[in-house]
């Protein structure tokens, strides 16, 4: 057994890269679907660097000694400049609060544009819905595993992504308002 501490230098493969929880040498590892942002950061702070932007960092090669408080170094030695947090990060949301299982895990086929979620899936005037009776087995399994994140609304339907009809179990409308429950934090 090896201690599986996820950090910036980790770029694992397969299911364990994201779903293996941190454990001590004496504990048996456990799996989770509540994948925290550190798991995303190991891979997604490179190339597209979306994880850096999310937490208010930008990779740079220039260092301004007069404003040294605005700079830092990552564990792998890269120089970063501190910037404002992404609005979703500032609100305390996790990466998986927006990114769906279909967008992250895929459909088993290669796609040019794998991303499932769009801003309008939460922020459009009228959201897309799917009747609960039309949930696929994989989709129904998630609602069974995490019933606290499962919200229904109008006539037994669920809000879904426009692109692929992926259920957004943690998003609902109530009394004229729209709410999202954090998949990790559980906060509304």
Regions found by a protein language model. Give the residues of each.
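C-type cytochrome heme-c attachment and multiheme electron-transfer modules
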Residues: 1-24, 31-188
């Amino acid at each position: 057994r090896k201690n599986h501490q996820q950090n910036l230098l980790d770029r694992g493969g397969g299911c364990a890269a994201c779903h293996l929880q941190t454990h001590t040498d004496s504990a048996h590892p456990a799996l989770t679907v509540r994948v925290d942002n550190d798991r995303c950061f190991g891979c997604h702070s490179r190339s597209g660097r979306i994880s850096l932007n999310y937490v208010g960092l930008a990779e740079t090669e220039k260092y301004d000694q007069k404003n040294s408080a605005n700079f830092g170094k990552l564990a792998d030695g890269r120089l970063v400049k501190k910037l404002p947090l992404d609005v979703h990060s500032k609100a305390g949301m996790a990466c998986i609060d927006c990114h769906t299982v279909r967008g992250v895990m895929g459909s088993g086929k290669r796609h040019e544009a794998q991303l499932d979620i769009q801003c309008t899936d939460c922020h459009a005037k009228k959201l897309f819905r799917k009747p609960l009776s039309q949930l696929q087995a994989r989709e129904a399994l998630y609602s069974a595993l995490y019933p606290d994140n499962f919200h229904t609304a109008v006539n037994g339907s669920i809000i879904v992504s426009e692109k692929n009809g992926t259920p957004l179990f943690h998003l609902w409308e109530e009394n004229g308002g729209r709410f999202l429950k954090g998949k990790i934090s559980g906060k509304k």
